[in-house]
Amino acid sequence: MKNSARVSSVLSPVRSPIVIAVAALVTVAAALAAAGPPAADVGPTYAIRNCRIVPVTGPPVEKGVIVIRDGLIEALGPADKVKVPGDAEIVEAEGLIAYPGLISALSNLFIEQPAPARTGAPAAETEIPSLAGQAAPAEDRYPPGPGQLVLDQLKPKKATVESFHKAGFTTVLVAPARGIFEGQSVLLNLNGEPIGPMVLRNGAALHINFTTERGGYPSSLMGTIAHIRQSFIDADYYAARQAQYAKSPAGLKRPEYDPRLEALVPFVRDRKPVVFQCNNQEDIKRALKIAAEFKLNALLAGANEAWRAADALKKSPVPLLVGLDFRPPATSKYATQGEDLRKKAEAEIYPANAAELAKAGLDFALVSGAGADGGTVLRAVRTAIKAGLGKDAALIALTIQPARFLGLDRALGSLEPGKIANVVLVKGELLDDNAQVAKVFVDGVLFKYAEVSK
């Protein structure tokens, strides 16, 4: 798998009052989420001593120290080279391994109501219809739609936070899951129960699904594709008219304000990220065509059949947010040719998706997806490893790679001075079956869990 610096950030630069501190020759990183809620309160200064440090972006430190101050990593390195500050609270970590907090770049965490069932109507064709000159249907001109912010639907629960902490996760992208234009996601740092201090970036990405809801509009796959295309065409035209009027309004009729098209403009004109949910290989091909047509800053989520579309993805490489649901989609031959083949696919073929992508040299992150608790997600990662994905590749796909995809690699995704102090202390190797998470730091806030067994 390629995990080099060639991977560009596909989300807009991070903007907020949090300034990422620097150490040595590290330059000052960008700040987080403009106009977002205030940063989380930070605890005291900590010095984590005598742990093995796995930075991800550098070689391990066998017996090291990590100093955390004001929610940031102030220093880290071998114990004989890092001075422990006199005001630091000592966290003794003999026998533990320190990892950067894991990142899930797609989840439905804290969404109280489950998403309505989808029809999953199959279609083999990937032809995209031409709709020039037709207007987007009125039935979908108002929320739920592209302007809907999933943040408004979230209700954090302590048990859910703890579940993800105990699996090593500290950061999640929470996305809506209803409709075609599902709305906009929010990026959270899991630093407690109130939602406000968790927010790293609201309106992080626009999410689109090709599968219509039962009884929804449009009612067919071709109608859905046409609706998506026409919406982007209309948004581009709307933006052009607004820009023309703003530049020279004299003699021009004022363009009518349209909240739905207004919400789409940043994704069409400013290249804010658009995440396509791809439930099968045909969805991947459709998404690639639409992304190319409108020059979208696209990511493909789910992608559990990406291995079957590897050639297309090599020609048009985009970030892949690979889900850990190993059930074959309804459109697959593995789901339609008998129970024995379906079970074999679920146990052997689909768990190898990530391993095949790594062999093909495609960049991907592993994501928790919908409806799973932290423990279930981590078990699925281990299943992917047993199916051939290397442990190092899996760790990269859960840390620095999603951070790169989210435009956060200067703040998260590895253990380095100046980055946000998201640190997980583990008895054993995190991705092993017998690993136990002992302590978790998020934004420098310490969460203590049950004492690990000796």
How would you describe each model-predicted region?
Residues 157-305:
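Polyanionic/metal-chelating signatures
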Residues 114, 127-131, 135, 139, ...:
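His/Asp/Glu-enriched, well-ordered alpha-helical/loop segment
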Residues 1-16:
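N-terminal secretory signal peptides that target proteins for export/translocation
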Residues 291-297, 314-321, 361-363:
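Glycine-enriched alpha-helix->loop->beta-strand junction motifs that scaffold or abut catalytic
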Residues 51-54, 404, 416-454:
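C-terminal cap of metal-dependent C-N hydrolases
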